[in-house]
A protein has these predicted regions:
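Glycosyltransferase donor-sugar binding loop
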Residues: 65-68, 205, 258-276, 293
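Acidic donor-binding loop of glycosyltransferase active sites
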Residues: 302-319, 333
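An aromatic- and histidine-rich active-site surface loop
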Residues: 100-108, 119-141
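Conserved donor-binding/catalytic core segment of Leloir-type glycosyltransferases
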Residues: 225-241, 247-250, 259-260
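Nucleotide-activated donor-binding/catalytic signature segment of Leloir-type glycosyltransferases, i.e.
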Residues: 272-298
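Acidic anion/phosphate-binding donor-loop and adjacent secondary structure
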Residues: 13-15, 185-189, 196, 204-221, ...
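N-terminal strand-loop element at the rim of the active site
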Residues: 6-7, 12-15, 33-38, 49-102, ...
Length: 426
């Protein structure tokens, strides 16, 4: 909007490493989590716990009342976001769309009232960004975003509109956190953001508790072979995870591993019945076991412990880090990855599995044979080094350093309501 006065907000650095400061105080950070559960929620929970254990950061997580980790003692929660859950699909969809508009506004007002220094989006409601953008700009809050997926695989309503708004959200942020060099480059190319706003932080391992039952007992209960390697494909069945390519690779492999598929489909993605039919068509139905349901946390560790290795045959359109890979690292199970760029980069760097040359069945079969041979020969994978390099404490250390620089940065001018507004140069 033309004719608006220019606005400049100075960084609030009193008591935070500013010259002549007598007293240091923690940086006050409020996270925004839109979904009540899932991978991003778990990531935010682990990061908030690691940050909350530090003396230089004070953490609050703004979430829905049914957020799975709302009562975690490692940080403070504010459960004032509108819930998107409902047993009736149509009403759940309505709540989801309603919350796209309501929750960012609720969050921003909470952050301002709580005296927050930095807001950190675990999710961004880019669909409704024009609705809450002015409230964000006028708040004067510093903005950080965890970018788990640079692009969205599927639109909510309109792809062109949503891509435009997503890029706008990225550009208004003061700091963007990614998990790989590939994602950093992708973000620069996609949204045109400055490279110095992007910070690479590790995605830590996901613990799922103690394994109560012996691996052999779990295999017997699930009808899995005791005399053959078992590969685990775990998580939601999504098309870009390339389970079809993995099943087609099984008859091409010189080894004969058994595949356990644990998880269910969702939305417009193909479900378990499609993959059962495919296994029959390629002649490996007797070598694939389906556990086609939601897997509760208390069962996750058992499935990983009962498996010899974990299959992540994701296609190159899958450009985020994988929570499944980090569960595998926790339970010290090597992984098979294909051409998914972030996973390929991670495994090449850390020696915790085999990175295939592509995601087509032939390349996957070659990778399967290589990994089966390594497992059979008791290959020593670098899990200890991985857990040290990709730890939550290291993530929190790097993240807190960025927070400090955000508070000390010189203000930059961006648009307010179409004219000029505030941001920071980090």
């Amino acid at each position: 909007m033309t004719g608006l006065p220019s606005i400049e907000i100075q960084p609030v650095i009193s008591g935070i490493d500013s010259p002549g400061s007598a007293v240091e105080r923690p940086v006050c950070v409020c996270f925004y989590v839109f979904f009540p559960a899932g991978g991003i929620g778990r990531y935010t929970n682990e990061l908030a716990r690691a940050l909350g254990a530090r003396s230089d950061v004070e953490v609050e997580v703004a979430c829905t009342p049914d957020f799975q980790w709302a009562h975690d003692p490692g940080y403070r929660t504010w459960t004032g976001l509108r819930s998107i859950s409902h047993p009736i699909p149509l009403l759940r969809r309505f709540r989801f769309l309603q919350a796209q508009f309501a929750n960012p506004v609720r969050f921003l007002r909470r952050a301002v009232n709580a005296g927050t220094d930095i807001i950190h989006f675990a999710n961004v409601n880019h669909l409704s960004f024009p609705y809450w953008r002015r409230e964000l700009e006028e708040s004067g809050l510093r903005v950080a975003i965890s970018v788990h997926d640079v692009k969205r695989q599927k639109p909510i309503l309109n792809k062109a509109w949503e891509e435009h708004q997503l890029k706008a959200v990225y550009r208004i942020a003061d700091a963007l956190f990614v998990h790989s060099a590939y994602q950093a480059d992708e973000l620069v190319t996609y949204a045109g953001v400055a490279r110095d706003k992007i910070h690479i932080v590790p995605h830590g391992p996901y613990p799922h508790g103690h394994v109560a039952h012996d691996a052999a007992d779990v295999r017997k209960r699930l009808g899995l072979p005791l005399d053959r390697q078992v590969a685990l494909f775990f998580g939601q069945l999504r098309d870009e995870k390339n389970l079809a390519g993995l099943i087609r690779a099984l008859p091409l492999s010189k080894n004969r591993p058994h595949l356990l598929v644990a998880g269910e489909g969702g939305g417009a993605h193909r479900g378990a019945d499609f993959y059962r039919d495919l296994a029959r068509k390629v002649g490996v139905a007797d070598r694939v076991t389906f556990l086609a349901r939601y897997i509760p946390d208390e069962e996750v560790g058992e499935l990983f412990a009962a498996s010899d290795w974990v299959a992540l045959p994701y296609s190159n359109s899958f450009t985020s880090q994988s929570g499944v890979l980090n569960i595998a690292a926790h339970y010290e199970r090597p992984v098979l990855v294909s051409s998914s760029p972030v996973l390929h980069e991670t495994v090449r760097r850390s020696d915790i599995g085999v990175a295939c040359d592509g995601d087509e069945p032939g390349a996957l079969a070659a990778g399967i044979d290589q990994l089966c041979t390594q497992v059979m020969n008791n290959y020593s994978y670098a899990f200890a080094q991985y857990r040290q390099q990709f730890s939550w404490d290291e993530n929190a250390r790097l993240t807190s350093e960025v927070y400090r620089r955000m508070l000390l940065a010189k203000p930059r001018r961006i648009s307010v309501g179409g004219g000029t507004s505030v941001g920071l140069t980090v």
